[in-house]
Amino acid sequence: MSTKRQKRERKQAALAKENERSTLISFISFFIIAFLFFLWGSWLLPITDPVESNYALTAREMVESGDWMSPQIYGVYWYDKPIMVYWFLSLAYSALGFTDLASRLPSALAGALSVALLIWYLRRILKDNVVSIWAGVMLATSLECWVISHAIITDSLLLLFTIPTMLSAYIGITENSKKHLVIAYAGAGLACLTKGPVGLVLPGLLLVLWCLSMKSPKTILRLFPWQGLLAFFVIVLPWYGGMYAIHGSDFINEFLGLHNVLRATSSEHPEDNHWYYYLILLPASLLPWAFVSFYEMKMRWKEKGAFYLFLMVWCWGTILFYTLMATKYVTYSYIAVVPAITFAAFGALRIRMGEKLPSILGGLGLLLLMAALFAGTFRLKEGNWLVFYAVLAYGLFAYLIRWKANQYKRLTIISAVTASAFLCCISEGLPHFMICLLYTSPSPRD
């Protein structure tokens, strides 16, 4: 009996080891594919004013001055954002020089890592390869993820650190795993070094709301392990404490007061201050997967399991949080894309099984995205759009005309056509569009 048990245990250990190896290979493979996808054409995109140039110029001065602690622009200390994005940009500049490619490398890297991490976490939580892989594919081909993974802003890095913050917290709470809760707090610490206090405050609020929705007191108690709090402070205190020691109240007043509290209480862009702002933005951000995502949210409403509630609180709690903030900005709700895309990945199972309505909704999302890009080609006449038109024609033919024949290829068609269209845009129209922005936007000095 003992011998049989030992054989069974050895077999289970071998299977577990093989599964870990397979997971690692998948992680690396999807990271490389996503990284090349996001990196393609980045060298064609000039740095635009004023937002991108502020980050790029600050990082350049960091390299040239040798002061990697205090961000500054034109010799003036700059407290707009924490240090993380400047460190990544400075490392890229140190390795590749002050080029457009180096400027966009950190966002491409963060976007690819986000895709790979989402696949890893969903495989870990759901034990479902199909859902996890399609979640990664859908995230990479969603409109906002593709755009932000090419932009010189903080949001790509914020998403990268928010994924382990939220998903490790879910694992830590549901499985009572101290290790994953420490990872979650470490992710929150890195997010605070990227975007500021919101990197901890928003995930914390979302997790507390989710724990309350579970109606289980022990989940709340598990949320605050001392080891996690220690990990958080070990990560954030060196820079925040160092900045206060060097700059004193100027840092506190400008960083926390002007760039955090004031933006939350006083609108920086009054023309965008509408309650429905993010309700319009989220579906557009998710294209071509928006309708599949919302359909799956509705279909799973009656289940209301732990992971469903977690994703709903994450998605709509983020939208509510930023709706209540005075300043509205197109990238603020970016982290809501991850739970919404996860719902779309659940919907992928229905499309793969040939269900009619999810397949129609997937095609509708593709049609809207292609229509928007098609309209853009008439505004940007400098590019050669023949390849894009061929991609569009193939998409219409494969998805609509050969509807029944391609029943089990619909997901592949949507993702392939979307990815191809994005690559056409970055090779032809987007560089011309950004050059126009460069000459019509105000200088960061203004």
Indicate residue ranges for each PLM-predicted region.
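Intrinsically disordered, low-complexity coil/linker segments enriched for acidic/polar
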Residues: 2-3, 406
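Membrane-integral, polyisoprenol-dependent glycosyltransferases
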Residues: 3-7, 15-357
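Alpha-helical and His/Cys-centered functional microenvironments
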Residues: 10, 16, 436
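Short, cationic motifs built from Arg/Lys/His that form the positively charged side of catalytic pockets
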Residues: 104, 445-446
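Membrane-embedded architecture of ER/inner-membrane glycosylation machinery
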Residues: 182, 299-441, 445
